[in-house]
């Protein structure tokens, strides 16, 4: 009984409004009332009206809605609905939606306070939870893009995706326009340079005139320097391979005459300043054939020393693993002739490009986030607090991944056209990399400790990753602490347990053998697991994604393919280097794709700045505000630090870390 003020918010995207009428019902603990056809929702507007209700409803539990269409279906994007009881109590209820309303079925929006099954002892929301998950499991089914990989969402086309997983119009227009621009630029570069010679390293400048960053220009000018080569293992686009050596690698076989090198390495090892980057993952991967021309791969090992000034300097490069019955592979040194040493470094940089794009970026960023997305939609109803906590960090992931499978890594896609791992090698590499998806490697406190990078003052990735993890962890603990007061509450939450099990056993194909949990036994363990999911979708992906434009635009620093075999002798010349590096077309296409993926995104939500409010009430809002305050402090401190650095490290700066895997 009484008067209610109802406010309905419609999204801002181009087609968010609807010409169809919307009917509403209020559902409370003690009754339900139909409000009738209340509005035709208008794009980017909050529409408010009052209703007089003759029934006593008690505390509101749901708003039900139905969109009625006459002749033409017109989808509506509903942000949220708020209902305020006018009178003595002035109770206000928040019903988040943030999805498309399609068809003429009745949809129920539960109140935004959120609860677990344990926190709903009367079972007021039980039927809704079960119905929602039943519908979602039909919409979100597991699929397998390639045998031997972790699972993905079923469906090979964008139209196979649930409508709520597709780009809104602004994002779609920007993405497709940038793709068209990149292809136009590629055609122009090819036509302008079709008759030009391709004989010196300076010739790469002829295609280096669009989409450059300040750091990319620095890379062009300094890429041959050993200090910049070493720096990239610490703070470049792929800081995930470097580890402190605890012994000399078994694969490092010293040919006769290399006793002095062995002594130098053992000296650095004893001092704790010896590091390694091992690309053994590339061993025995089948190399691509592009336009009937064989391409080539190596599996390098790089040994580096950390100097007192913080610089990481290469000491030796081995391009092949030793083979039984063969002579030890040559070891390339900084004292070798300049072109010999440069070619060895180019092989390392090309190998790093392959491993970056396939393992660090696609597998450990995009495909992992897809597993989290599908499992979340299948196992957690919208009223569940973990759903509310994690769903802003899953936005657009399914569409961007379907686009990647259809364009980048598809048959005859970009990888097949220009990458030395294309033509099937990329799938083989992903399959082999799956064995290294350990739980600890997704948690920076564990991963950095395992790799011996804690305390390395010149590893800004390590410092920033650890700090960002801790900030996200406190945020997760703050939200989870509102709903889980005891470890028993975690153990008894069957939806949470199902979600964890779905990720580990189904999505990740039995990853318990790599340390992923199949159940959550305490509040601390649950918080750690959720933090891992959010960090992977935000900070970790951004640390890998954002460096592409800076480090991969100058093609000799990250060759997409190599056109001659890895050297086995030390007689390389400039002609050898140019004949090995990508040709004009391959280089131009690499630059265009890197620009499209690495450019500043105009449609981008920074970490923690999502506008969607899935929680209602002051307590979750206070936790989110504290999270944003900590992110702002970190952002400012990184800005101050970077002013003193020769090369600023930006990739984990919260203001440019994206809130989800959306590009």
From Swiss-Prot:
SUPFAM superfamilies: Lipase/lipooxygenase domain (PLAT/LH2 domain), Lipoxigenase. It catalyses: (5Z,8Z,11Z,14Z)-eicosatetraenoate + O2 = (12S)-hydroperoxy-(5Z,8Z,10E,14Z)-eicosatetraenoate; (5Z,8Z,11Z,14Z)-eicosatetraenoate + O2 = (15S)-hydroperoxy-(5Z,8Z,11Z,13E)-eicosatetraenoate; (9Z,12Z)-octadecadienoate + O2 = (13S)-hydroperoxy-(9Z,11E)-octadecadienoate; (5Z,8Z,11Z,14Z)-eicosatetraenoate + 2 O2 = (14R,15S)-dihydroperoxy-(5Z,8Z,10E,12E)-eicosatetraenoate. The keyword Cell membrane applies. It comes from Oryctolagus cuniculus. InterPro entries: LipOase, LipOase_C, LipOase_C_sf, LipOase_CS, LipOase_Fe_BS, LipOase_mml, PLAT/LH2_dom, PLAT/LH2_dom_sf. Fe cation binds at residues 361, 366, 541, 545, 663. It is a peripheral membrane protein. GO terms for molecular function: arachidonate 12(S)-lipoxygenase activity; arachidonate 15-lipoxygenase activity; iron ion binding; linoleate 13S-lipoxygenase activity; phosphatidylinositol-4,5-bisphosphate binding. Pathway: Lipid metabolism; hydroperoxy eicosatetraenoic acid biosynthesis. Non-heme iron-containing dioxygenase that catalyzes the stereo-specific peroxidation of free and esterified polyunsaturated fatty acids generating a spectrum of bioactive lipid mediators. It inserts peroxyl groups at C12 or C15 of arachidonate ((5Z,8Z,11Z,14Z)-eicosatetraenoate) producing both 12-hydroperoxyeicosatetraenoate/12-HPETE and 15-hydroperoxyeicosatetraenoate/15-HPETE. It may then act on 12-HPETE to produce hepoxilins, which may show pro-inflammatory properties. Can also peroxidize linoleate ((9Z,12Z)-octadecadienoate) to 13-hydroperoxyoctadecadienoate. Changing residue 418 to A: Decreases 15 lipoxygenase activity. Exhibits hepoxilin A3 synthase activity. The gene is ALOX15. This is Polyunsaturated fatty acid lipoxygenase ALOX15. Its EC number is 1.13.11.31, 1.13.11.33, 1.13.11.-, 1.13.11.12. It is an enzyme of class 1 (oxidoreductase). Belongs to the lipoxygenase family.
């Amino acid at each position: 009984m009484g008067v209610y003020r109802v406010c309905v918010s419609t999204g801002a995207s181009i087609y968010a409004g609807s010409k169809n009428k919307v009917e509403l019902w209020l559902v409370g603990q003690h009754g339900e009332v139909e409000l009738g056809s209340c509005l035709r929702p208008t794009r980017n507007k909050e529409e408010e009206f009052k209703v007089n209700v003759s029934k006593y409803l008690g505390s509101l539990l749901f708003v039900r809605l139905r969109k009625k269409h006459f002749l033409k279906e017109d989808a509506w994007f509903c942000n949220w609905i708020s209902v305020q009881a006018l009178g003595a109590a002035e109770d206000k209820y928040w019903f988040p939606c943030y999805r498309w309303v399609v068809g003429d079925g009745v949809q129920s929006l539960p109140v935004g306070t959120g609860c677990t099954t344990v926190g709903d002892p009367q079972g007021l929301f039980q039927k809704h939870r079960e119905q929602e998950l039943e519908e979602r499991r039909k919409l979100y089914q597991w699929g397998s893009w390639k045998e031997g990989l972790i699972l993905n969402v079923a469906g090979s086309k964008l139209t196979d995706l649930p409508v709520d997983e597709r780009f809104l119009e602004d994002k779609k227009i920007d993405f497709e326009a940038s793709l068209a621009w990149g292809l136009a630029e590629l055609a122009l570069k090819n036509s302008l340079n079709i008759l030009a010679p391709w004989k010196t390293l300076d010739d790469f400048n002829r295609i280096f005139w669009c989409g450059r960053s300040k750091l990319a220009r620095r890379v062009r000018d300094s890429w041959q320097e050993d200090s910049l080569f070493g720096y990239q293992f610490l703070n470049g686009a792929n800081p995930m391979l470097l580890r402190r050596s605890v012994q000399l690698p078994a694969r490092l076989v010293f040919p006769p005459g290399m006793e002095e090198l062995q002594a130098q390495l053992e000296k650095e090892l004893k001092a704790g300043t010896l590091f390694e980057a091992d690309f053994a993952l590339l061993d025995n991967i089948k190399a691509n054939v592009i336009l009937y021309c064989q391409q080539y791969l190596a599996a390098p090992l790089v040994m580096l020393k950390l100097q007192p000034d913080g610089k990481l300097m290469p000491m030796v490069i081995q391009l092949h693993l030793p083979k039984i019955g063969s002579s030890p592979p040559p070891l390339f040194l900084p004292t070798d002739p300049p072109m010999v040493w440069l070619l060895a470094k180019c092989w390392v940089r090309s190998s790093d490009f392959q491993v970056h794009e396939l393992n660090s970026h696609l597998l450990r960023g995009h495909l992992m986030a897809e597993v989290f997305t599908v499992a979340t939609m299948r196992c957690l109803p919208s009223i569940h607090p973990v759903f509310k906590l994690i769903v802003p960090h899953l936005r657009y992931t399914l569409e961007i991944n379907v686009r990647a499978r259809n364009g980048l890594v598809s048959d005859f896609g970009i990888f097949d056209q220009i990458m030395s791992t294309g033509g099937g090698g990329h799938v083989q590499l992903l399959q082999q990399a799956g064995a290294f998806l350990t739980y600890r490697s997704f948690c920076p406190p564990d991963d950095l400790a395992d790799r011996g990078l804690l305390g390395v003052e010149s590893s800004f990735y390590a410092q920033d990753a650890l700090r960002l993890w801790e900030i996200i962890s406190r945020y997760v603990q703050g939200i989870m602490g509102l709903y889980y007061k005891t470890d028993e509450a975690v153990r008894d939450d069957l939806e949470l347990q199902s979600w964890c099990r779905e990720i580990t056993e189904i999505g990740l194909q039995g990853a318990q053998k790599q340390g992923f949990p199949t159940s959550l036994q305490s509040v601390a363990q649950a918080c750690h697991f959720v933090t891992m999911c959010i960090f992977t979708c935000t900070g970790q992906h951004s640390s890998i994604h954002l460096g592409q434009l800076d480090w991969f635009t100058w093609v000799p620093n990250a060759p997409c393919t190599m056109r001659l075999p890895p050297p086995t002798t030390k007689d390389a010349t400039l002609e050898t280097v140019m004949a090995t590096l990508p040709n004009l077309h391959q280089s131009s296409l690499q630059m265009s794709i890197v620009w499209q993926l690495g450019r500043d995104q105009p449609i981008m939500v920074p970490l923690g700045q999502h506008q969607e409010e899935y929680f209602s009430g002051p307590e979750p809002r206070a936790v989110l505000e504290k999270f944003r305050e900590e992110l702002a402090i970190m952002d400012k401190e990184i800005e101050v630090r970077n002013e003193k650095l020769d090369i600023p490290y930006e990739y984990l700066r919260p203001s440019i870390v994206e809130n989800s895997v959306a590009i």
